[in-house]
């Protein structure tokens, strides 16, 4: 007569911590496995998944790394993107590397990067 999974789980649920520890040791010996190795193997992918989830950003910063040769076009692009005045945009371009836009969506960051690169700037999205 085989026990069902539910019956096994009920039996385990009724055990004390000491009894569970002894059961695990006996299972390790009988089947030639280590519960610690299984725990590490299970934890490693979970940690990797957590890192992948942490890498999924929702806010991005567009950073002007270099103005490039065509500084006037870059200043115009910065003014269009930010709404800054001529002097403020020129100061931002001259002070590169500097953030142009912060806390924006990925699509907006990519569009801003494209616009600045078309003007001749070197841009990073962080």
Swiss-Prot record:
Cellular component, GO, one term: cytosolic large ribosomal subunit
Keywords annotated in UniProt: Ribonucleoprotein, Ribosomal protein
SUPFAM superfamilies to which the protein is assigned, alphabetical: ClpS-like, Ribosomal protein L7/12, oligomerisation (N-terminal) domain
Ribosomal protein listed as a keyword: yes
UniProt GO molecular function: mRNA binding; structural constituent of ribosome
CDD domains: Ribosomal_L7_L12
GO BP: any one term: translation
Cross-referenced InterPro entries: Ribosomal_bL12, Ribosomal_bL12_C, Ribosomal_bL12_C/ClpS-like, Ribosomal_bL12_oligo, Ribosomal_bL12_oligo_N_sf
Pfam families per UniProt: Ribosomal_L12, Ribosomal_L12_N
Quaternary structure annotation from Swiss-Prot or TrEMBL: Homodimer. Part of the ribosomal stalk of the 50S ribosomal subunit. Forms a multimeric L10(L12)X complex, where L10 forms an elongated spine to which 2 to 4 L12 dimers bind in a sequential fashion. Binds GTP-bound translation factors.
Similarity remark: Belongs to the bacterial ribosomal protein bL12 family.
Role noted for this protein: Forms part of the ribosomal stalk which helps the ribosome interact with GTP-bound translation factors. Is thus essential for accurate translation.
Name this protein carries in UniProt: Large ribosomal subunit protein bL12
Species the sequence originates in: Bordetella petrii (strain ATCC BAA-461 / DSM 12804 / CCUG 43448)
Lineage, uppermost ranks: Bacteria, Pseudomonadati, Pseudomonadota, Betaproteobacteria, Burkholderiales
């Amino acid at each position: 007569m085989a026990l069902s999974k539910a019956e096994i789980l009920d039996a385990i649920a009724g055990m004390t911590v000491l009894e569970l520890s002894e059961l695990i040791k006996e299972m390790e010996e009988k089947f030639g496995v280590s519960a610690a190795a299984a725990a590490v193997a299970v934890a490693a992918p979970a940690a990797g998944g957590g890192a992948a989830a942490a890498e999924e950003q929702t806010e991005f910063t567009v950073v002007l790394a270099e103005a490039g040769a065509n500084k006037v076009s870059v200043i115009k692009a910065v003014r269009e993107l930010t709404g800054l005045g001529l002097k403020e945009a020129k100061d931002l371009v001259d002070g590169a590397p500097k953030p142009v836009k912060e806390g924006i969506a990925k699509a907006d960051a990519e569009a801003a990067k494209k616009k600045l690169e078309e003007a001749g700037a070197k841009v990073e999205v962080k």
